[in-house]
Amino acid sequence: MASVFEDAIDTFLGPIKDLLENDKVSEIMINGPGEIFVEKSGLVFKASNKFSDEESLQAAMRAIAQSVGRIIDSNNPRLDARLPNGSRIHVVIPPMARQGTTVAIRKFSKEKLTLKDLIAFGSISADAARFLDICVHLGKNILVSGGTGSGKTSMLNVLGARIPKTQRLLIIEDSNELQIKADHVVYFETRQADPTKNITSVSIRDLVISAMRLRPDRIIVGEVRGEEALDLIQVMNTGHSGSMGTVHANTPVDSCTRLETLCLMGDIKIPPDAIRKMVASAMQIIVQCSRYHDGGRRVSHISECIGIDQFGRYLCKDIYRWVQTGKDHDHGRYVGETVPCGYIPTFFEEIIINKLPFPKAKFVPPDWYRKMMEPLATTTANGNGNGNSSKAAA
């Protein structure tokens, strides 16, 4: 199959072959034959590459579909697939795509990042990284939240690599993107239905149910975006501590609300209040990943979900957050740092009992941050704040 794919690249994807082979390009976006954009270092640029016409672009996409055993035509106008080289591709053809065949190729990264790499990139501080390492070691359930392209999968890869090698991991994804190094790991991937071949679909929810019967120590779901959220919550609440997943949301509080909404999408009817309590109980640590306007991907918040307040709102306390302090105009990059917010997690005693080297002083915010936050604290105390519980801890 790989040779068919390579032949398809040589024959049909000549106009973008240099982009596919350029390691600095992370994503290729085709908006019809004459308009191609690429993402480099988190920023999007217009490329000079072009296809000769719509017919040649569609021919290229049909060849790609064929190389992965799929069809894209008027009856099947959308293609979502993983290519043999690991890249993800999504295609929509006319008339659904009015400006011409539209394609997004997210290239597979051969580079396996570590926490040290994220520290070197400025995505997270050494103390915050060490704290996350401890959370993994202690078996805390972790939800990685963020928008598209914010680095959620990379973070999940990094955290998964810190799981003790003696534990059995079951990893479930729509398309294989995670590359977690472990001695005892099993990968599952969903399958789309193909009525022409009498092939039924296998969903993430199906695989979560199977995973629970395969004696996992931890279950990792690459992306939670449907009714399988309820199954993951139940996994986390029934003895499989240290499980992880990602979700699309903009803040720690929003990530909990998003999970709650996804849980309610299924056929199992559970009262919303009960779902909310289950989510609050399961989600212990939330790692919020964000992509900033300078192209940088950073951990904007590390928060602990400690329950629900008297009004039924999720209580998420920031432990660390990234704060912008300036801008490097020469390089167009934001300047900032990850700072502790002054909140000590409820499981700090576990850190002490396990003799993990992380003193309470690591949670004390710097003076400049405290002074910066004093006006906000005063406003909130006077009842004029916005009530964002994820920021109240600061």
Regions found by a protein language model. Give the residues of each.
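NTP-binding/hydrolysis catalytic cores, primarily Walker-type P-loop NTPases
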Residues: 1-9, 301-394
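The Walker A (P-loop) glycine that initiates the GxxxxGKT/S ATP-binding motif of P-loop NTPases
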Residues: 146
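Switch/coupling sub-region of P-loop NTPases
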Residues: 129, 139-142, 154, 158-282, ...
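Phosphate-binding/switch region of NTP-binding enzymes
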Residues: 274-310
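Conserved glycine(s) of the Walker
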Residues: 151
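N-terminal anchoring/assembly modules that precede and organize ATP-driven motor systems
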Residues: 1-48
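Active-site phosphate-binding and catalytic loops of NTP-dependent enzymes
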Residues: 11-18, 64-81, 167, 266-273, ...
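P-loop NTP-binding catalytic core
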Residues: 22, 39, 45-138
